[in-house]
Amino acid sequence: MGGLRDPHILRGEDGWFYMAVTDMKCALGWNSNRGLVLMKSKDLIHWDHHTVHFPTKYAGTQFANVTRVWAPETIWDPQAKKYMVYFSLRTNDGAIPYDKDYYCYANADFSDLEGEPTYLYDRGSATIDMDIVYNEADSLYHGFFKNEDLGGICKVTARTLTAPEGAP
């Protein structure tokens, strides 16, 4: 860990607190975020923490050349019965030329991510700082995010956390 930003804390289904954080190397600038930190606490005072370094974990894949993994957040996925960690991601080799939203599921002890990042949302231009909430009144997930190119806060909705592109 070189510095932390964008902390997101979630009180879990089991009463524990889960935090996902951008692992930022501040002295190296905005494109120095090669991973994220997963943290877990029973009391908000004592934390177990684990860094997920994408170039190491995903060596040989399109995710090995990340320049930034930004603003991770966590939400419980009732269908998968796991914590979903979602984040904005961009690479320096053109494979992912602008910030797009991806997700992975955290493993059982919240110390690592399972599998490769899966595409969550792409507006066709850079999107960052996604926040997803479930609204029981309309039975929809609402995703709010910043559009880097057009400015402002945008919103998308879905019936499930991992709805196919374009599906409500």
Residue ranges and their predicted role:
Residues 1-69, 75-168:
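Beta-rich carbohydrate-recognition and catalytic domains
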